[in-house]
Each structure stands twice: as structure tokens, then as C-alpha cells.
Amino acid sequence: MTRLLTHPDIAWREDGTPFATAFGDVYFSAQDGLAETRAVFFKGCGLPEAWAGRAQFTVAETGFGTGLNFLALWQLWREHRPHPAARLSFVSFEGYPLRAEDAARAFAAWPELSPLADQLLARWPGPVRGVRHLAFEADGIELILHLGDIAQTLPASGFRADAWFLDGFSPAKNAGMWAGDIFPLIAARSAPGARAATFTVAGDVRRGLAEAGFEVRKAEGHGRKRQRLEAVYPDADEPVIPLPRRVAILGAGIAGATIASGLKLAGMEAVVFDPAPEPARGASGNALALMMPRLDAGDTAEARLLIDAYLAARDFYLGRPGAELTDVRQMPRNETEEKRFGKLLADPPFPLEDLEALSGGGILHKRALILRPRQMVLSLLDGVEVRAGAMPDVDLGARSVNGEVFDAIVLASGMGMGQLLPALELAGRQGQVEHLSGAVQAPPSALASGTYAIALGNERLWGATFEPAGEGVSAAVSEAARAENLEGVEALSPWWVREAQGGAAVSRASVRATTPDRLPLIGAAPDAGAIAALWDGKAERASSPVLPGVYVAGGFGSRGFTWAPWAAAIIAAKLCNGPPPADLNSLRAVDPARQILRRLRKTGRL
């Protein structure tokens, strides 16, 4: 199995309908696919009436195809959004993603959708396995697209849908999408009273839904199809959990800023606390930052997690103030790394639009980003209340900050998290960079080989060191680190040596919070004492007690700008009772409780 998914071969019929040659079926009805979506799925799931008065509504779909159902639903949501802060999540599964040009050709049949189609096509995901997250903030709608074989991606997902669009190709031509073991998975991911709709009335589908617990009935079909199916999952009396209204966020760096921005869009009042006199004074305060992927040669769960986070971050930053596209030339540091690059390029995790081999054994990372951190952080905090300049007095048990009670608290303060949750394993690593402003303007560019060097306009930045920081969260510049950075630049190119030596560079050091396994801590804050009390030598992470209303987003190391948007989306999903933009393997990998459970397994003690 290759790391990249296969694009489907499309044949275009005379009436403009796309036809999947591998499956021998059309992507939508020749009798107006948009009308079919409305008649089969909207009517079958009771939309838009079903989301009236809801703060969060989730629609799931089997078979993303051209994306027509998503566009039509987006249009309906814009017309019937319950209130300005309401959120609509669309979770879809696709094993053979279309090329953007094929999707554009399909959308051309409906000019009324073009304003939305243009937005989707501008961010169209490539054929990269994993979970893509596209948030269209102005309309409060998000697309969470699980790319890969549904037999693997659906069991690995964790969410509850209020409505299901069952829209794979015909069961006779795409049996895997309608396999018997799919229906129990759909039921397990259905909220009480969830409705499902599909164009087919095949007996296996009717029986599969019924055996999974749905009440199934036939309804009048669309076009040439005389009938379709509607199904309802049993309702249940569940307590309505009110969404948090006021959330305290500790930390005004990129982690806190992305979280605050997302919660504000969800209609919550976010208050950010930071002991520094102003935002972006810590590890998020360098003049420039480089965001490029960390790619592993193997197709592991961790490798996919890193790719998911990087692509989510790139999509999040593009178009915002302080973000510039760039190519990064990365050269191997040694023979071992050169072999790793070769293995990586033999089965690349990205298409050629993003990744290319360089002579000399290097890699060209296309469409990476140069960021202006302070500008980005301040733009995200626009309209958010920030209380800076004093160390806040925090009581996690009472969910209070300086005596003021909040509905939830999010810890996004880097090394400061360890003072409030001492059971977390965090180690400080000091990083020093050198920055100068010169007279010569340069287009966005970057080199990397252990050290990285960034040019943007008249600014140059290079570094960074990565050394133990000792106790505390303070950092100090040093001549030794400055010399190390200059030595790193000398290995990059003669041009950069001249740039580095041609002006008065200013050194800046900051402390970054890291974890032993190099993965971040994202999710509910674990209750270490309660976990230890329940420990029986085989406790499962899913049952680990947590501190009510307390969440963690940190341990990002030197990749804070990569992890932050992905982490913010996960925290927002938890607070809004929405679907996470990640699979269960990824969520387990970053669950803060993993550290406590690992210690208990190893030593039997906290």
C-alpha cells in the first residue's frame, strides 16, 4: 500500500455527468445531482428543521465524491443557520479523492454554488491519507475529511452524528462501502434520534440498517429512482450539557491565541491570561518562524499524525496576516539522513505539488510557510480580552483565576503548565535565534539542514539551538549559542554566511516545553491522583479520570506553530461537543493521561 491515495479515473458523459470507470457508476444523478441531494438527503434527514435551535450539529457522510453534498449543505446552512454562533460539522469518508480540476468541472453545472465551490476548490485536499480539517469560519461550518479505506477510517473515527448521508456508489458496484460491518459502526457513531438517508433501497442496506438498530422505511425516490430509504436511530433521554460560556485560557502565545480565536467564533467569551506584559513574548515571539513538515520515512500512526497537524496548520494560516508561502530546500546532514530522505521519496507522503527530490539527496518542500509570529498572534487575539502583566492565581478544582470562576480553563502556557499539573512530564529546551534587518529586499525563501535560515523582505533569521534549559521558564542569550548558529549557517550556503556576517544581528532566546516522546499534550487534563487510585495494572486510557472543565494544549517543542491550530480545533471540539478533527489513534497519542499511565505501567507509582 502506497502512502498516497489513488485519484479515480473519470469519464465525462455527454450530459456532463462524471463517471467513475473503476466502479462503473456515476457520481450523481444525470437528472440534476443538486436536486437529488436535496430530495434524498435533506428531505430524508429533515433538514434544515432538525438543526433548529442547535448550537452544534453534525452531519456524517459515506463517500465524499465530488463534494456536491457538502456544498449543497453549506448553502442550506447559510440560509437557515440557527444563530450566528451555531456550528455545523460535516464529517465525510473517501477512499479515492478527486483531483481539484475534476471537482471544478463537476461543480460548473451549478453556477448558484460557485461562490462556495471557489472557496472549497482553493483549499481542495490532496490524496494524502489521514484526516483533513477545513474550517470556513465566516459561516461556522467545518469539513472533516477522513481519507483512506472506510474499513479502516470509520472504525478509527470518534464522533456522534445527528444525520447521515449514505452516498457511496451503488452497493452492487462498491460493496466495501456497504459491507455488513459498516452499519454497526454507523450506529455506534449516531446520536440519539439521528436520521440517515440514502438513494438505494437494496435489501442488504435495509437489513444492515435495521439490524444495527435503525427504524427503516421506504420513501418516494428522485428522478428515475422510484424509491429511497429513510432511517431513524432510537431516541434516548440524555441530559443536555450546556456549552461553556466563559473560558479562561492561560498563555498568550500561539497556542492560547489559536484556542481563543476558535472559541470566540463559537460564541464563547474567552479571557486570556499571561504574566508577560503583552502577548507573544515567550517562545512565540521570534521575528520570523518557519513552518515546514517533519516527515518520517515509515507510514506509521505518528507519521500520519504529524502530517495531519502540518496540513491543518498550513490551511489555517494561509490568507491570514503574517503568513507567506515559501519553498524550503532541505539538505541531509549526514549519510544516514540522506538514506532516510531517499526512502521517504521512494514512497512520498505528499504529492509533487508539495514535495520534490533535489540533486545532492535533498528535498524541496513546496508551499511551506514563513510566519511573522507577533503579527499572527495579535491578529488572532483581536477582539479577545487579554489580561497580561501579572502571574494569575489559579485554582483548577474551582475553575477559578484570580478568584473569578469560569466554565472551563485551558492551560496553554508552555512550561507554566507543569506548575499547575506537576504530574505532567515537561522539559524545557532553550532555543536561540539570530535576527537582523538589512537593506536588501529578498523574496520569501528558506534553507534547512539541522539549522534553518529564513529570508523575508529585508529580514533575515537563522538558528535555532536546542539545549536543556534547566529550572524555570526564563532564557538567556549566549555567545556560545550565537557561534553555534553561525556554524550552522556556514553549512547551508555562502550567501547566508555573507548575510549573517553583513549586519548587526540580534540574538533572542526562549524556552520551549517538550515531552519525552516528542508529541504534544492535547486534551482533557488528567486527574493524576484519581488515576493512581484506580490503577489495577491494566487500566485503559479511555477510562482515565479527568479534572472537570480543565484542558491542556502544550508540549509543542520547536513546532508550536505547527501543532497550535490542530490542537485548538481539538479543544474547540471538546468544548462544543463536536467531532474531533483527528482519528482515535491520534487523539490517544497526544492524550495527556498517557504520561501518567506509562509511569504506572513501568513503576506502579505516579
UniProtKB/Swiss-Prot annotation:
Q: Could you tell me which residues belong to the region FAD-dependent cmnm(5)s(2)U34 oxidoreductase?
A: 250-606
Q: Which GO terms describe its cellular component?
A: cytoplasm
- Where does the protein end up? Cytoplasm
**Designated gene of the protein:** mnmC
Q: What is its EC number?
A: 2.1.1.61, 1.5.-.-
Task: State a single Pfam family of this protein.
Answer: Methyltransf_30
The organism's superkingdom is given as Bacteria
Under which name does UniProt file this protein?
A: tRNA 5-methylaminomethyl-2-thiouridine biosynthesis bifunctional protein MnmC
GO biological processes:
methylation; tRNA wobble base modification
Gene3D superfamilies the UniProt entry points to: D-Amino Acid Oxidase, subunit A, domain 2, FAD/NAD(P)-binding domain, Vaccinia Virus protein VP39
Q: Key word Cytoplasm present in the record?
A: yes
The free-text function statement in the UniProt record for this protein reads: Catalyzes the last two steps in the biosynthesis of 5-methylaminomethyl-2-thiouridine (mnm(5)s(2)U) at the wobble position (U34) in tRNA. Catalyzes the FAD-dependent demodification of cmnm(5)s(2)U34 to nm(5)s(2)U34, followed by the transfer of a methyl group from S-adenosyl-L-methionine to nm(5)s(2)U34, to form mnm(5)s(2)U34.
Which keywords does this chain's UniProt record carry? Cytoplasm, FAD, Flavoprotein, Methyltransferase, Multifunctional enzyme, Oxidoreductase, S-adenosyl-L-methionine, Transferase, tRNA processing
Q: Which PANTHER family match?
A: SARCOSINE DEHYDROGENASE-RELATED, TRNA 5-METHYLAMINOMETHYL-2-THIOURIDINE BIOSYNTHESIS BIFUNCTIONAL PROTEIN MNMC
